[in-house]
Amino acid sequence: MRRRRPWRVTLVPLAAACACAQSSSAAPPAVLSSPADPGTRAFAEALEPRLFEFPRDHGPHPAFRQEWWYITGNLHATDGQRFGFELTFFRVALVPAPDGRVGASPATTAGESASAWRTREIYVAHFAVTDVDRKRFRFQQKLAREALGLAGAQAAPLRVWLDGWSLEEPATGTTGPWRLHAAQPGYAIDLMLEPQSAPVLNGAAGLSRKSEQAGDATYYYSMPRLAVRGRLLRDGQPVELHGLAWLDREWGSGGLGPREVGWDWFALQLDDGSALMFYALRDKDGARDEHSAGTWVASDGSVRALSNADVSIAVTGSWRNRSGERYPAAWRIRVPALALDLSVRPALADQELRTTPPYWEGAVDVGGHRGGETLGGRGYVELVGYAEER
């Protein structure tokens, strides 16, 4: 879930900034645009459940205004050092592509020559590393237009890229393995991801509604267990790593409802092979919105949709950023129907991406029990809407 914003992207600053790939503090595109914007009317909308087809749906969906590929993971070195990472790619369309192709060039008027810089697509990517043992959190954002091959996405074989950052598969017609590349000052990753299970459809057969208004929805699936092996360069020194990652995929053209201002998203991988995803949408008055929802994946692979009423979340700790704004920083999550009772704590307090607006996305530790069985695990949490735009 993304990211994911008070679910709106400001396209004018994005368009002005995208002459080339660059580090940027433009608004994160993990924000969906408002359906009240007349410009969204020509885009397809997520209105009804659809038939998902893999591996095709790992690739882009140009009929929709925005989508993202969101990968997070917890990794360990052979000597026990721990790292977390986030690598995320966002595709935002400025206008619909008339022929349905991502990156199709805008039409030109009579007497006007097309420029190689013209584009219908903007891409933004975030790369963050949590170096738990050294208590470091580093992040970078890049932004580019699709023109001239600066950024883009394709389905066969899967490839999503921006500048030197990429998610790609080596063979056509498969679901993994996938390779991740990204680098920023002090840290770089080269990782292979191997799916351990089939994609999991969230919501109503993959349709995830964000409010009561038609079109305020996305098509949403997850791959909650990706085995990871590869290498991280830290200050130029290689560290061999292994662990688990999580892939989230969403696409749509709508937004949050008018009362919704942010959300808390949990993606938890438990040691018994099960997984829990839940997003808690927050209204202006601080209450949890009724469209909050999630998914439970049992260790045998069976899937259960979770409604807002199924899940109890209590905040048990907090953290303040450099501006004094408070984020929740510890939680107790209970799902009575599953006899599930979990505690969740950040691996590092400061995992805030100080983009515009800022958001917190970080590695967490999980403990608790299900019935009489003790459980542990790791995961990622995303917190949006707690800090002011700057």
Can you describe what each PLM-predicted range is?
Residues 12-16:
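Hydrophobic helical h-region of N-terminal Sec-dependent signal peptides
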Residues 18-20:
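N-terminal Sec signal peptide cleavage junction
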Residues 2-11:
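Bacterial N-terminal signal peptides that target proteins for export
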Residues 22-390:
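Structured soluble/peripheral alpha/beta segments that form catalytic or ligand/cofactor-binding pockets
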